[in-house]
């Protein structure tokens, strides 16, 4: 059974500690994945103001965020400038590429994108993407071939802004099938590879304990599904690393074969159906996100 494995790297600590551990785990399992890196300042701690929103407060309690992520991640960029992830930790991003994994852009400023992408104008969106692409391409020594919007904060406005960068594909949305978004001028845009499986932090809580997660998520894989699964370097690369190692073993026993997302694309993208990325909501995730329509 074919599946796509996507690894989002949101923070400085996730890059420094989570990525090396994940590379070792993936090497042990002989699995290749797609890493999406945040490369600018780590300002993730600025999300704390969202605690005033009941849905975000409940999510933080439900997922036991302090123990799951660590206070250094939860406070990053609050009382001090965010550390420059790409400048300091670029060699770890190159290491992922050299190990045979697919590497793409997550964001320049992950917090900035999540907080503002829905209201930035065309110029601001393009500038953010441009900064990220320039930084990551300098680090890798290669063009950036794919991207994934931070927090799945994407809509048709974001889709249009990304067209100028010539990505092979984007993974900006939650959905069920590969598709090409319809652009304002009637053309079909860059292919979208949506995520169709929930993440650890979306489902773990009072009704599902961490130890039961692997069986829960593996039971969601099916031959007729897209089977794109997302992990986070800050979670599965640190506190849940042993659980992820076990998940890969259990997936192998079920004949689930993980691949980089780019390998899910057909030889000809002309056969992909048309769709759109619109704003929607998902259980377990606070705020809006891009969903396939």
UniProtKB/Swiss-Prot annotation:
The reaction(s) catalysed by this protein are:
4-deoxy-4-formamido-alpha-L-arabinopyranosyl di-trans,octa-cis-undecaprenyl phosphate + H2O = 4-amino-4-deoxy-alpha-L-arabinopyranosyl di-trans,octa-cis-undecaprenyl phosphate + formate
Task: Extract the InterPro entries matched here.
Answer: ArnD, Glyco_hydro/deAcase_b/a-brl, NODB_dom, Polysacc_deacetylase_ArnD
**A GO cellular component annotation in the UniProt record:** membrane
One GO biological process term is: lipid A biosynthetic process
Keyword field contains Lipid metabolism:
yes
* MF (Gene Ontology): hydrolase activity, acting on carbon-nitrogen (but not peptide) bonds, in linear amides
Q: Which PROSITE patterns match?
A: NODB
At the top of the EC hierarchy, this enzyme's class is hydrolase
Which range is the signal sequence, renumbered to this chain? none
Entry similarity comment: Belongs to the polysaccharide deacetylase family. ArnD deformylase subfamily.
* Protein name (database record): Probable 4-deoxy-4-formamido-L-arabinose-phosphoundecaprenol deformylase ArnD
Look up and give the organism this protein is from: Pseudomonas savastanoi pv. phaseolicola (strain 1448A / Race 6)
What's the encoding gene here?
Answer: arnD
